[in-house]
Amino acid sequence: MMKKLLLVCSLCLASMAAWADGLQELEKFLREVSSGKAGFSQVVTSPKRATETVARSKTSTGTFEFLRPNRFRFEYTKPFEQTIVADGQMLWLYDVDLNQVTARSQKEVLGSTPAALIAAGTDLKGLSDAFELKPGAAKDGLEWLEAKPKDRNGQLQMVRVGFKQGQLSVLDIEDSLGQRSVLTFNNWQANAPLKAADFKFEPPAGASVMRP
């Protein structure tokens, strides 16, 4: 579940030829989009083993929503139900099948993660403090931005963010073990009518709660 934490959502756009425009669009996104919700599909591909001819992959689907500052929710619905909620203070991870909740301080675990970038500040300063940014080549009808964490000790190695017509379309995330997670978003609702109470999480009755 902690690896899914890395997935978690936003930079913005830019092609090699339009980096200035991409920065302006990113700044506009951070400034003008304070909340949002979308559906997503996620494909996680593990490095191919010596005995394998094809890399292993798993697909899951769900919904995502966020509210600045520092609140977001991932609801994984298929093939297994899992919930990741940041309420502004704590990060909650709930595995329905295990009936287990893991609670961590957001400050301790988010740091340089895609989710923190989506739901954190409203300007570029924090983004450039945490990541080395460079434009990627346009591909598949998307404009790409590459972000490499300045903290080299974390699990996250690289985030590639694809935008289409100013809308977040794809997050392509690579971790230190070579695992790749690609989230493709759909049905975005920018500035959705969300409130802080929507991100409150209460452990279900009978669930075991772990606080590492």
Residue ranges and their predicted role:
Residues 6-11:
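Sec-dependent N-terminal signal peptides
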Residues 14-17:
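N-terminal signal peptide c-region/cleavage motif recognized by signal peptidases
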Residues 21-46, 94-157, 211-212:
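Flexible, processing/modification-adjacent segments and terminal tails
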Residues 63-115, 181-182:
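An acidic-aromatic
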